[in-house]
Amino acid sequence: SLVGSEMCIRDSIKAEIPAKAAILLGQHIGAPAKPIVAKGDVVKVGTKIAEPGGFVSAAIHSSVSGKVAKIDTIVDASGYAKPAIFIDVEGDEWEESIDRSETLVKECSLTSEEIVKKIADAGIVGLGGACFPTQVKLCPPPAFKAECVIINAVECEPYLTADHQLMLEHAEEIMVGVSILMKAVKVNKAFIGIENNKPDAIQLMTKVASSYAGIEVVPLKVQYPQGGEKQLIDAVISRQVAAGALPISTGAVVQNVGTAFAVYQAVQKNKPLFERVITVTGKSLAKPSNFLARIGTPMKQLIEACGGLPEDTGKIIGCLL
């Protein structure tokens, strides 16, 4: 089977904070962010270190506390040299504005415009892989009207279980995030699409959704590439995106389930996007795991936390398909 999810541990582990972090300025689709710190500046966890570089761009925040070592290029996973902010880590001091408690905050009194601004300030981007700046997606062109929000919790990519794990651990927070997204685009209906190979997530999310107005969990047959935006819209609301048209032309605003959780954290907890759950897996690893990892953590560190690579490892790759 290509699914491979049986290899992953059913809990997410907090990855160790790196000794040095390299935070890319172009983590998202669109213009790279512009640095607002310089060598020698002291930063905390959650400090804004770069502003959006254009309309389609995203703010970047420090995932660590310490001192800016340099702003230089680093070779990214695609093999290209990209600008990044390098930080020497000292301690783990967070910005005081971030609510670090685990208390669930359900009520949101902000207006749609205030929600979108808070999401933009927090640097939230789509966490399904494309990293499209979320605030842009929540402000469609005037010619289009949103009718519903669709949450992509399909995770059809073989071996990945990060979204699955997130739903099992943070179903309530995700549901509040979905409600906030609904308010942001002024709709009263949301659908959460989950494939049938995650029955525990479907059961839990359905139970939690029952106490939130207008949110419906939609079980879907297991089919690749159902996690694609256009395919998901068709599967959930039976509307096709015409060739060359935007997905919003169907009335749907699609967001990843990880993005919904990040929106909850940004709007309700004042927490910018500086960490995410990531799956590190494969038959070469002694202990495949899901990690809650700070952005800028070297992949080598996560691989070593899984037991390291044997000498006969063929390749280290991203998604299979």
Question: Which residues does each PLM region occupy?
Answer:
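Short, small-residue-biased leader/transition segments that mark boundaries at the very start
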Residues: 2-9
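Acidic, glycine-anchored pre-beta loop/turn
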Residues: 7, 37-43, 75
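Short beta-strand-turn/beta-hairpin segments enriched in glycine/proline and small hydrophobics
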Residues: 11-30, 51, 60-62
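Short, well-structured beta-strand-loop connectors
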Residues: 38-51, 70
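Conserved hydrophobic positions within beta-strands
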Residues: 66-68
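Acidic low-complexity segments
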Residues: 75-132, 143, 199, 212, ...
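Gly-rich Lys/Arg/Thr-decorated short loops/hinges at beta-loop-alpha junctions or inter-strand turns
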Residues: 95-97, 149-163, 284
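Hydrophobic alpha-helical positions that pack around
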Residues: 188-299, 305-312, 320
